[in-house]
Amino acid sequence: MILNFIFNVFFLFIIFFTILHKNEEKKSIKLKGKTMGTYWQVKIPYVPNQLHIKNLIQRKLDEDEKLLSSWKKNSLVSKFNKLKKNQLLAIDKKFFKIISIALKINKKTYGKLDITIGNLINIWGFGNQKKPHNYPSINKIKQVMALTGMKHLSLISNANKHYIKKNIDGMKINLSTLGEGFAADHLSSVLKKEGIENYTISIGGTVLVKIKNKENSKIIAIQKPTDKIQSIHLLIHLKNKSISTAGTYRNYYYLKGKKISHLIDPKTGMPVTHNLISVSVISSTALEADGWDSALLILGFKKAKILALRENLAVCLITKKNNTFSTWISPCFKKFLINT
């Protein structure tokens, strides 16, 4: 979900993999911009009205950001965060879908994907609060954790109308682990309505590939998980699928000499510290790939491996010990792998 850049073309310095191009059409265009604190890039066949397409893409992404942002005061997320317990907030189908996927993955990952940890994200300096100069106290963490938990969040549907509510005051949600995937799927539907059938969408650490031609595919390079010299770790081919990568080695800071990752374990209230540093997930939708990667990374290697096998997930896990990388690839991921 973070740090993705296009190899030899345009580097997005906050992602984990690079897109290479196989059977690249000579007449193609690349549109790019900013959204959700990261970069987006869309590659499509040449169209004469490319300015219209670019403006349309940016407008739709701006709409998504207004929907999902924790920073914008009038976003649905911000409106929910201001609710008192048991108050209903009317939501649209798009918001209903993203919350439904979050609830689904939460149940399958022992609660590791938890969108109700907005307060935890804030006290660790990855939300709308500044990075702390001291570790949050145990009492502070316990106090904030009392305001988390997907069990305190409810979706309600009635006569084609959707609502969301919380059953405790002070709970805040944060959808940063799902926003890029959601936006990529949204752009896919937008391009389809414009009659565009072949495209590659990159938003942060998420890539979505659609190809009508039966033979062609895109080659994706999963980057070696290091914040130093960028190099290719694995190559895969992708067609009509999405891949999302989460990692601990880019979005972090040091506090009293210790590395603080942006990935917070909702069960402990603490940033993850284990040696699983990168997780890539391939799925039919970008939203699900984006949700699974962070949850699996928070789980740690052993539990993530067991879960990937149990759920038949296409997963690549990379661990690091003493500056040595080790890679585990699930059986479902192997069919995408390019042997080099």
Curated annotation (Swiss-Prot):
The keyword Membrane applies. GO terms for cellular component: plasma membrane. Its cofactor is Mg(2+). SUPFAM superfamilies: ApbE-like (SSF143631). GO terms for molecular function: metal ion binding; transferase activity. It is an enzyme of class 2 (transferase). InterPro entries: ApbE (IPR024932), ApbE-like_sf (IPR003374). It is found in: Cell inner membrane. Mg(2+) binds at residues 177, 290, 293-294. It catalyses: L-threonyl-[protein] + FAD = FMN-L-threonyl-[protein] + AMP + H(+). Its EC number is 2.7.1.180. It is a lipid-anchor. Flavin transferase that catalyzes the transfer of the FMN moiety of FAD and its covalent binding to the hydroxyl group of a threonine residue in a target flavoprotein such as NqrB and NqrC, two subunits of the NQR complex. This is FAD:protein FMN transferase. The gene is apbE.
